[in-house]
Amino acid sequence: MAKKQTEGYMSAKESRRISKENRKITNQFEKQRKRKNVPESEYLTTMHDPQNAVEFDNLHTYFFTDTGTVKSVDGVTFDVPIGKTVGVVGESGCGKSVTSLSLMQLIQRPQGQIVEGEIRLNLGNGKAYDIVKTPQEQMQHLRGNYVSMIFQEPMTSLNPVFR
């Protein structure tokens, strides 16, 4: 009798084990993110160059799935100077959108998490926030007021009636 080929397949038991481990990891990140009344000093930072609007420094954004961890963004570093346009170019699936969504803290949670690095946002009043450490409560204030995004399908996001 021929032996069943299992190479490339994962058992249900292994999938449950990975899923349980990943849930523990994501729960820790979510607990940190959802804290209330966090003192500003915990996410206040300084820009490496005050002429930058945003600084990505060694950003790692991972997705914790039932079958393992997907390292979607793994060590990205770049700056966006104030008043300048920066194009992020790469192959399909290389992490361009996930990098931008990380800045907005809009990655799919709880599976998607920023696990390492800094994203420094210059607020223009001598203050800068490390977006990675900024709690959800504060991010709601920052989105739209200090940072915004036009998504990949602009026709579904932009209304030509509003100028």
Q: What is the predicted role of each segment?
A:
Residues 1-163:
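ABC transporter nucleotide-binding domains
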